[in-house]
From Swiss-Prot:
UniProt protein name: Protein RecA
GO CC, one annotated term: cytosol
NCBIfam families cross-referenced by the UniProt entry: tigrfam_recA
Gene3D superfamilies (UniProt xref): P-loop containing nucleotide triphosphate hydrolases
Length: 349
């Protein structure tokens, strides 16, 4: 093999070809991987601080994200919180409601500015994905949510008879659309969130029988895949059920370590409990101490029981702000791993 030498003529030729590529295909079409702008991945908050930590900072901009899980596990709630966070920062959000099930009142309760939220309710999967592509190409939208992949019905299936067998139509539709959309997403910096449902594979003896809809293309194109599950129903005495405890596993993450887990409360009619997340992190960082059922702060007992501790923080915003500031200081100084449990899995299922 011939020796590789550092020839000035090669550097000159490289500079010329890079300039030619940028003239032909636009600035940023080719760059060195170590460029500062290339290495930095900006993020937006998911609406849950514990999940932001598990993600390594939040939902990455300019990437495709898939949120999947069983019914009533919090998929849409999580997506709406992400929309609310973008709008609070002055961004533009769009919601492609393929299921035709978006509730304006619930969205408003979660902090979504429904007056400025762009909503599309397409009849076919082709129309929905074309709308997404045009929104992303405009570079004027900061986040697009598609609810859901299972509802992206191909036009041929809608126009056909109910009993017709249409093999692989949706998978081919998703594969073609993602090939087209993926590059534009990276250039625009838009966050594109696909919500997905689970199905059961028949005759599976070993491994999980669960599979997401829409084929395998989304699994490959997504930079982040979040598996959200309901693990507990929250009850309060005679009042009955008032929420659920959700667990999110980061099944795939191309911008931070994967397989981390975050848990948070979702309160019916209110969404993710911000104070619940804060209390969990405050306990893990030793800002708030717990002995038995009692929670204490600065050596003084503040409440008995977790629900009462959350209510105390809600009723005392000044104390909550102080605790949040102390928690954030500790998170910036220390490792994030203490706030995130790790799974035993070493590969994506």
């Amino acid at each position: 093999m011939a020796a590789i030498t550092n020839n000035p003529d090669k550097e000159k030729a490289l500079g010329l070809v890079l300039n030619q590529i940028e003239r032909n295909f636009g600035k940023g079409s080719i760059m060195r991987l170590g460029d500062a702008a290339r290495m930095r991945v900006e993020t937006i908050s998911s609406g849950s601080l514990t999940l932001d930590l598990a993600l390594g900072g939040g939902l990455p901009q300019g990437r495709i994200i898939e949120i999947y899980g069983p019914e009533s596990s919090g998929k849409t709630t999580l997506a709406l919180h992400a929309i609310a966070e973008v709008q609070k920062a002055g961004g533009v959000a769009a919601f492609v409601d393929a299921e035709h099930a978006l509730d304006p009142n619930y969205s408003n309760a979660l902090g979504v500015d429904i007056d400025n939220l762009l909503v599309a309710q397409p009849d076919t999967g082709e129309s929905a994905l074309e709308i997404v592509d045009q929104l992303v190409r405009s570079a004027a939208v900061d986040i697009v949510v598609i609810d859901s992949v299972a509802a992206l019905v191909p036009r041929a299936e809608i126009e056909g008879e109910m009993g017709d067998t249409q093999v692989g139509l949706q998978a081919r539709l998703m594969s073609k659309a993602l090939r087209k959309i993926a590059g534009n997403i990276g250039k625009s910096g838009c966050v594109v969130i696909f919500l997905n449902q689970l199905r059961q594979k028949i005759g599976v003896t070993y491994g999980s029988p669960e599979v997401t809809t829409g084929g395998n293309a989304l699994k490959f194109y997504a930079s982040v895949r979040l598996d959200i599950r309901r693990i507990q129903t929250l009850k309060k005495g005679s009042e009955g059920e008032y929420g659920i405890r959700a667990k999110v596993k980061v099944a795939k993450n191309k911008v931070a370590p994967p397989f981390r887990i975050a848990e948070f409360d979702i309160i019916f009619g209110k969404g993710i409990s911000r104070m619940g997340c804060m209390l969990d992190l405050a306990e893990q960082t030793d800002v708030v101490n717990r002995k038995g059922a009692w929670y204490s702060y600065n050596g003084e007992n503040i409440s008995q029981g977790r629900d009462n501790a959350v209510k105390y923080l809600e009723d005392n915003p000044e104390v909550a702000d102080t605790i949040e500031r102390q928690v954030r200081e500790k998170l910036e100084l220390g490792s994030l791993n203490f706030a995130i449990s790790q799974t035993d899995d070493n590969e994506e299922e």
